[in-house]
Amino acid sequence: MDTDVTNVEDIINEIDREKEEILKNVEIENNKNINKNHPSGYIREALVINTSSNSDSIDKEVIECICHDVGI
């Protein structure tokens, strides 16, 4: 019984994490048009999300290059 409860809690936690990631992405897309005159702000938000996740989807050197190119 405890194993079932743990599995359900794990599933709920994973769903919550995925929901938060989706909400972040939606917020970025919604702000895209607002920030179109200020692209560095949009890029900064995207970099924060990419670097705050546990994934290695973006390399630190790439982030530094992007930050340098847009003057962040």
From Swiss-Prot:
Q: What InterPro entries does the record tag this protein with?
A: Orthopox_B11R
Question: What is known about its induction?
Answer: Expressed in the early phase of the viral replicative cycle.
Pfam families named in the record? Orthopox_B11R
Protein family (similarity comment) = Belongs to the orthopoxvirus OPG197 family.
> Any idea what this protein is called?
Protein OPG197
Species annotation:
Vaccinia virus (strain Western Reserve)
